[in-house]
């Protein structure tokens, strides 16, 4: 396991390095005017622009710029925002919004895991019964209906009949977070329920379950001590990635409820050509995805040490 973990860690770091390099090179292919604010473009002469670019090191050879870029990354220095918040460190610009998305994402993921897994267990336990039909109908509905429609239904029901605020507000964080968290949870609950039901139903057809019944084990013991444990093994691989992706923010949900989180930040940065913010966000999202996959692989091996996730050398 240690050998595989180290190997996957090295692969993840190399992937992050390559993505960061690719993003850096793509940013350098853009016109240099995007490195100035709109006010600077109007006021600066060509000589002043050249001097500013030289001072920022943007006229240095690409290899030299790359070395400086990697050094800055190691020190968590991502530069300053030039258009969204002129002069503010990118870390500060992203940090405030990341905190909001992280809080909503973690709460939504926790709710989704508990409700979704429990729903999947009950569907598997009462397969082809009324509860299973209801759960399946919910899963189909959530996946078939566009997110904007389901968000609108939640908004109307939650605001009209339950009195929750329709827009996110920093003055009333708790109440105004209910509808966004609900919308984030809807699809995740359906996903976890579907996975849990599927894997548990598959396990219920295994020979060892028939043997357990012959030995006289109760349905509850079979379901929770054997079926659920084995069914959760393939699921845990996706849980870290799901959490990290959710924490990264939801563009549609955050736009819909005016949540000042991570979701709209990338599109705003692209539209306003704030290159340092764009560069940092792309790298951040890549890191979240890669770390999620890495943690999922390792977690699956921790849950069931019998599993060998492997290359050819480990299969021998």
Predicted regions and their residues:
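Membrane-water interface segments at the C-terminal ends of transmembrane alpha-helices
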Residues: 23-30, 137-165, 185
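Residue-level signal for discrete positions within transmembrane alpha-helices
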Residues: 12, 97, 101, 137-144, ...
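Membrane-interfacial helix-loop-helix junctions in multi-pass membrane proteins
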Residues: 54-61, 79-85, 172, 270-276
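N-terminal Sec/SRP start-transfer signal
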Residues: 1-13
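Hydrophobic alpha-helical transmembrane segments of membrane transport/permease proteins
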Residues: 16-67, 161-173
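An internal, D/E-rich "acidic patch" concept
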Residues: 58-117
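Alpha-helical transmembrane segments of integral membrane proteins
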Residues: 2-3, 98-131, 147, 171-316
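Short hydrophobic, aromatic-rich alpha-helical segments embedded in or entering the lipid bilayer
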Residues: 44-76, 177-178, 257-269
